[in-house]
Amino acid sequence: MALHDENVVWHSHPVTPQQREQHHGHRGVVLWFTGLSGSGKSTVAGGLEEALHKLGVSTYLLDGDNVRHGLCSDLGFSDADRKENIRRVGEVANLMVEAGLVVLTAFISPHRAERQMVRERVGEGRFIEVFVDTPLAICEARDPKGLYKKARAGELRNFTGIDSVYEAPESAEIHLNGEQLVTNLVQQLLDLLRQNDIIRS
């Protein structure tokens, strides 16, 4: 849709985001997990979603690989396509936040500018940047998908951490040590959500 199309008008809904939050019993936010491939983003996000589900919190997990099977199946891994991938996911996450959900997203999202773009779209207070900080050597040793091996062999181009840059967050809301146990990292995130009055259970 062209930004200048005057025939497309925003339609307000009778049920507000605040009313949806009241219905759910918690605030709507997005936890944006970022880090290298193999850092543990999806694993920690999945562990947190499971813990929140047990507490009765309404959640949804958007995973980097999964969205490329549908929403972003037409995109490659050029800088332009990666930016569009993050833009689309940011828009979906924002809609889910307005629905009152706690949204967890697990994406490498290597560039600060793109993460900032989503932060501005969702709004301060509703965007929690989660940096899963795991050394490259550990990520390579894990290599659950064999991608680092392919990148080192020259079979995979533009791979983050090898021949494509990863810009680490400078002021993430929470900085996780990706070498710790997943249960410890999940507990740190639960503590953060409670401290910020996002969940009460």
Curated annotation (Swiss-Prot):
Top-rank lineage group of the source organism: Bacteria
Gene Ontology annotations of biological process type: hydrogen sulfide biosynthetic process; sulfate assimilation
EC top class, as a word: transferase
Stretch list, region Disordered: 1-23
One Pfam entry name: APS_kinase
Catalyzed reactions per annotation: adenosine 5'-phosphosulfate + ATP = 3'-phosphoadenylyl sulfate + ADP + H(+)
Role summary: Catalyzes the synthesis of activated sulfate.
HAMAP family from the UniProt entry: Adenylyl_sulf_kinase
Protein name: Adenylyl-sulfate kinase
Keywords: ATP-binding, Kinase, Nucleotide-binding, Phosphoprotein, Transferase
This enzyme's EC code(s): 2.7.1.25
Binding site for ATP: G35, L36, S37, G38, S39, G40, K41, S42
Signal peptide (UniProt feature, chain positions): none
Active site: S109
Recorded family membership: Belongs to the APS kinase family.
Single Gene Ontology MF annotation: ATP binding
